[in-house]
A protein has these predicted regions:
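A short, basic N-terminal segment
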Residues: 1-91, 240, 252-264
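Short glycine-rich substrate-engagement loop in P-loop NTPases that contacts/grips substrate
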Residues: 90-97, 134-174
Length: 264
């Protein structure tokens, strides 16, 4: 039988779906139950989709793991952040963070940075990690670190024949978004200020945004970081937001929230 021969048909029986008409097209090959064939194709499509989803999830989890986000905070998304809808300013900072994450492609064109400052437990870490998780989901890279850990990682290269100082610093300078937590709990030595400047300045020059988290006030943060770092963070409309409502961790009622632009 060749391709020009007429199609042959014959009744056949499927153990699952019962009677069907089998067809022979060429090489004496008879078709299977059409319903079985349709189900097999659908299963193959589902299996392919599930495999792609598993691979995508694995890649996302790897990026989150590489971002240095502590296990306690890996589920701290923006959508899980609880706000007091009666507090207009808390709603405003949440809206700012949400827009920052959703418009991150535009943020990367300007390198716009900002700070979340103020009292312990007001949700600064949650908001910043929520931004990181959102941009990672969108294909960008992020690093979350404390200032102390960043300084320690650099110092460890001095007595280590493994990574060089430049290799360690590149992890902080080359990611799309860098979040530096606990700024201000260090001694603020010249060495620490120099490392901070090197990181922030490199990111500033390459339009890579940075988020600073600190329990200090605006003026205290400025004094701790130094004029050079502070000036670079305020470029392109960089802002400092002062969170001074009651502890977010206890889900208490929110009070006074003030958003403050960098002083000129």
């Amino acid at each position: 039988m060749n391709i020009h021969d007429p199609i042959l048909e014959r009744p056949s029986q499927c153990e699952t779906h019962g009677e069907f008409i089998a067809k022979c097209f060429m090489n004496n090959h008879w078709t299977k139950c059409q319903t079985c064939s349709t189900e097999e194709r659908a299963k193959e499509a589902r299996d392919t989709l599930n495999a792609e989803l598993r691979a995508k999830t694995a890649r996302l989890n790897a990026k989150i793991n590489n971002a240095g986000i502590p296990q306690r905070f890996v589920n701290k998304t923006l959508s899980s952040y609880v706000i007091d809808t009666n507090n207009d300013k808390q709603c405003a900072i949440f809206a700012f963070c949400t827009d920052y994450a959703l418009d991150f492609e535009q943020v990367m064109k300007t390198g716009k940075s900002f700070m979340l400052l103020g009292s312990v437990g007001t949700g600064k870490t949650h908001l910043s990690i929520g931004i990181a998780l959102e941009i990672i989901k969108r294909g960008h890279s992020a690093i979350f670190t404390s200032a102390s850990k960043m300084f320690r990682n650099v110092k460890e290269t001095y007595n280590n024949k493994g990574k060089s100082e430049n290799e360690v610093l590149s992890a902080f300078t080359e990611c799309d978004l860098l979040i530096i937590d606990e700024v201000g709990v260090q001694r603020g030595t010249d060495y620490e200020k120099d490392i901070m400047f090197d990181v922030i300045n490199d990111r500033y020059e390459n339009l890579r945004p940075t988020i600073i988290l600190s329990n200090l006030s605006v003026e205290e943060t400025k004094a701790h970081l130094g004029e050079r770092v502070f000036d670079r963070l305020r470029e392109n409309g960089g802002k400092a937001f002062l969170l001074n409502w009651n502890s977010y961790r206890s889900i208490a009622e929110a009070v006074n929230y003030q958003a403050v632009e960098f002083a000129s």
